[in-house]
């Protein structure tokens, strides 16, 4: 068994990787002050893994704390996965492959593992990232925008003037709070739709839309094309990397 850990900006997710399958284990908030305690609470009872594979976008401190905890708990190698020029059938579009966020890289690998065809991968988390993968496994690049929470934080001063953001039944709203919510939501939806349209023109086919991340369920009802929810796409990619290891 190998232990897979995805350290995101907001959440840490983990899973067990075994030949032919992986099992989601749980999640907790990315908080460096209590990271070791959260790991101990959720993972201490696991049998000793052969190795620990980590995707980390939350900074060096979080990664170091996790590695120190895992090494002390089991005395096992801790491997931090890095973006590569190509791996497992996927070709990185970035001239400097290491500059592509490892979460996006593993999302591409996870998507290719589950569906070997063109797809548009939307990760709706702290940031909203959209990456295009063609039918040959080539990454065509991506776009990055603010996530829903980031937009709310940026508009906090307007909320103070007009009340806290709240849902709006339609697109146009007659109070500041709902108008903010509508604008935030449809800014994200608009970027996804524009990305889909441009992807279809570039590839001359309609790529499947894969949706992952903490805000995936919020955005899904507003997307007009068929959507496939993939809750733990980074862990899917980590599992593929784990299976490649000797």
Swiss-Prot record:
Residues at which ATP binds: 6-13, 126
Top-tier EC class: transferase
Cofactor(s) the protein needs: NH4(+); K(+)
Keywords on record: ATP-binding, Coenzyme A biosynthesis, Cytoplasm, Kinase, Nucleotide-binding, Potassium, Transferase
Keyword Cell inner membrane: no
EC number: 2.7.1.33
GO molecular function: ATP binding; pantothenate kinase activity
Subcellular location: Cytoplasm
Biological process according to GO: coenzyme A biosynthetic process
GO cellular component entries: cytoplasm
Residues annotated to bind substrate: 94, 101-104, 176
Record note on cofactor: A monovalent cation. Ammonium or potassium.
Entry keyword Signal: no
Catalytic-site annotation from UniProt: 103
Reactions the enzyme catalyzes: (R)-pantothenate + ATP = (R)-4'-phosphopantothenate + ADP + H(+)
Pathway where it operates: Cofactor biosynthesis; coenzyme A biosynthesis; CoA from (R)-pantothenate: step 1/5
Domain of life (superkingdom): Bacteria
Similarity section: Belongs to the type III pantothenate kinase family.
PANTHER family for this protein: TYPE III PANTOTHENATE KINASE
The protein's assembly and partners: Homodimer.
Function: Catalyzes the phosphorylation of pantothenate (Pan), the first step in CoA biosynthesis.
Protein name, UniProt field: Type III pantothenate kinase
Species of provenance: Methylococcus capsulatus (strain ATCC 33009 / NCIMB 11132 / Bath)
Phylogenetic placement of the source organism: Bacteria, Pseudomonadati, Pseudomonadota, Gammaproteobacteria, Methylococcales
Gene name as annotated: coaX
């Amino acid at each position: 068994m190998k232990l897979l850990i995805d350290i995101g900006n907001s959440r840490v997710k983990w899973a067990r990787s075994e030949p032919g399958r992986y099992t989601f284990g749980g999640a907790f908030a990315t908080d460096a002050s209590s990271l070791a305690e959260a790991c101990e609470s959720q993972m201490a009872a696991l049998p000793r893994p052969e190795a620990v594979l980590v995707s980390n976008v939350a900074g060096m401190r979080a990664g170091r704390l996790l590695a120190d905890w895992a090494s002390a708990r089991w005395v096992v190698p801790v491997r931090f996965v890095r973006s590569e020029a190509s791996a497992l059938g996927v070709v990185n579009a970035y001239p400097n492959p290491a500059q592509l966020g490892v979460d996006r890289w593993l999302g591409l690998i996870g998507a290719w593992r589950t569906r070997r065809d063109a797809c548009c991968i939307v990760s709706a988390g702290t940031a909203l990232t959209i990456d295009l993968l063609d039918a040959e496994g080539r990454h065509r690049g991506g776009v990055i925008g603010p996530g829903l929470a980031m937009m709310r934080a940026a508009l906090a001063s307007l909320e103070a003037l007009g009340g806290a953001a709240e849902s709006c039944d339609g697109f146009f709203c007659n109070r500041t709070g709902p108008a903010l919510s509508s604008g935030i939501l449809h800014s994200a939806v608009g970027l996804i739709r524009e990305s889909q349209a441009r992807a279809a023109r570039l590839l001359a086919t309609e790529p499947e839309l894969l949706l992952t991340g903490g805000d995936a369920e919020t955005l899904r009802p507003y997307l007009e094309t068929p959507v496939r929810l993939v809750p733990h796409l980074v862990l899917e990619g980590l599992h593929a990397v784990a299976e490649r290891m000797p």
